[in-house]
């Protein structure tokens, strides 16, 4: 596996859960650095190798390679309690976290953020977003409103007063808007200081560090969270996450300039899934959805919620490619379709009787869209042991080629199982 450039951004091209962690782990075997640039511990990544499965939520997926420096960038939001627990859990599995570093500019998730997240979701009644209730949205809201507290604020001699003022403000919302009991300051302060002491020696200026490494010709992987269709600006609003998930945010969420980004790889599942509310044009409403869900183990890593299942939506994928800046694609969970004799791909939408090939902005419009399908022959045989594109059944090869023809972007590779070894490059190297 050759690498002809200094940096690669890996993003999800659907509604998350595409297998970004597995592909990041695969490429991290040749990387010097892996950076998480957005999201929080709401994004669970599952990595499998040597017959063991490992889950990470906020720590970059490169942590399983001891030679890789792993950086949690300034664009993330960090729950220190979750981070410390994740570090301890990895250490208990004999995985070193000495190579994990945290940006001093990252914003912090506190107990009040998670509580407000929960109370807001309950207040929405039938219009729920489907949030994980981990405080991600309220933390990003505080960041924009300039109420946020960053990791570097721990060094301020007035940190205790800053924290108290912040909690007092949020307790007003908790008690007067939601009629809930206030949170206790001493508990939050003591816990925060304990967790800060645990990670303080691993706090860095992520932008300074990553920029220097790129200038030294080190290979840097940028690991995205969620997917482009959950992007706060370009996703299916309001049923989105609270951060920017596209490659455009990799530089902002790390602290470098966008000219230091070379390539963008979009991870695309062989079918569509979605957690929570919001339109999903190609959703399967038959028993087939349950069958594919079980074959693909399509349940949330953090919440256990069953994911909604749909045929691959190429209208949405073309949109994600455009706004996500995607140069190449990587197909995952390809083997889940092994048992299907007929496979559909959504090539267009029908909106109010008109055929369209563009992705509507509003959930109201998307819910009125009907899928226009093209049906392909399946391969109906096990592909989990193939080691090259040429070993795939002809119809599986045709599936990949047909997607490429429609979206006009090539596949770099595909995955036929959960193990690291079941990851196959089509061309054997990264394209220039």
Swiss-Prot record:
EC main class here is ligase
Q: Where does Mg(2+) bind?
A: 17, 44
Residues that bind substrate: 301-307
Query: What are the recorded Gene Ontology BP terms?
Result: 'de novo' AMP biosynthetic process; IMP metabolic process
Predominant subcellular localization, coarse grouping: cytoplasm
Q: Which reaction does it catalyse?
A: IMP + L-aspartate + GTP = N(6)-(1,2-dicarboxyethyl)-AMP + GDP + phosphate + 2 H(+)
Pathway info: Purine metabolism; AMP biosynthesis via de novo pathway; AMP from IMP: step 1/2
Q: Which UniProt keywords apply?
A: Cytoplasm, GTP-binding, Ligase, Magnesium, Metal-binding, Nucleotide-binding, Purine biosynthesis
Purpose of the protein: Plays an important role in the de novo pathway of purine nucleotide biosynthesis. Catalyzes the first committed step in the biosynthesis of AMP from IMP.
> Which protein family is named in the record?
Belongs to the adenylosuccinate synthetase family.
Protein name, please?
Adenylosuccinate synthetase
The organism of origin for this protein = Mycoplasma mycoides subsp. mycoides SC (strain CCUG 32753 / NCTC 10114 / PG1)
């Amino acid at each position: 596996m050759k690498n002809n450039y200094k940096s690669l951004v890996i993003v999800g091209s659907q509604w998350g859960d595409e297998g970004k962690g597995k592909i990041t782990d695969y490429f991290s075997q040749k990387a010097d650095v892996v950076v998480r640039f957005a999201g929080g511990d709401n994004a669970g990544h599952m990595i499998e190798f040597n017959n063991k499965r490992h889950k990470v939520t906020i720590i970059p997926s490169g942590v399983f390679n001891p030679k890789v420096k792993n950086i949690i960038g300034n664009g993330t939001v960090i729950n220190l309690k979750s981070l410390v627990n994740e570090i301890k859990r990895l250490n208990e599995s004999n995985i070193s976290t000495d190579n994990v570093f945290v940006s001093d500019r990252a914003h912090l998730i506190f107990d009040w953020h998670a509580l407000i997240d929960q109370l807001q979701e309950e207040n929405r009644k039938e219009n729920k977003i489907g949030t994980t209730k981990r405080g991600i949205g309220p933390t990003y809201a505080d960041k924009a409103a300039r109420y946020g507290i960053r990791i570097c604020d721990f060094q301020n001699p007035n940190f205790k007063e800053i924290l108290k003022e912040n909690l007092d403000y949020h307790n007003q919302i908790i008690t007067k808007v939601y009629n809930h009991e206030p949170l206790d300051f001493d508990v939050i302060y003591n816990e925060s200081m304990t967790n800060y002491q645990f990670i303080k020696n691993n706090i860095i200026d992520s932008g300074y560090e990553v920029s220097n490494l790129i200038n030294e010709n080190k290979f840097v992987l940028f690991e995205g969270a969620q997917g482009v269709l959950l992007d706060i600006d370009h996703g299916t609003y309001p049923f989105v996450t609270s951060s920017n998930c596209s490659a455009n945010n990799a530089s902002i969420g790390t602290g470098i300039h966008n000219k230091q980004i070379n390539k963008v790889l979009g991870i695309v599942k062989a079918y569509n899934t979605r957690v929570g509310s919001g339109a999903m044009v190609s959703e399967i409403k038959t028993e087939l959805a349950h069958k594919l869900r079980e074959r693909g183990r399509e349940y949330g890593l953090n919440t256990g919620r069953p994911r909604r299942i749909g045929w691959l939506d190429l209208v949405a994928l073309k949109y994600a490619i455009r706004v996500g800046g995607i140069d190449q694609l990587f197909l995952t969970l390809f083997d889940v379709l092994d048992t299907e004799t007929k496979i559909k791909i959504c090539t267009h939408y029908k909106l109010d009787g008109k055929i369209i090939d563009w992705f509507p902005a509003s959930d109201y419009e998307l819910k009125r869209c009907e899928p226009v399908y093209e049906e392909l022959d399946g391969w109906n045989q096990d592909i989990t042991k193939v080691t090259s594109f040429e070993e795939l059944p002809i119809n599986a090869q045709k599936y990949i080629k047909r997607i490429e023809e429609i979206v006009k972007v090539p596949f770099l590779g595909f995955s036929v199982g959960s193990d690291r070894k079941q990851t196959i490059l089509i061309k054997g190297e990264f394209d220039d």
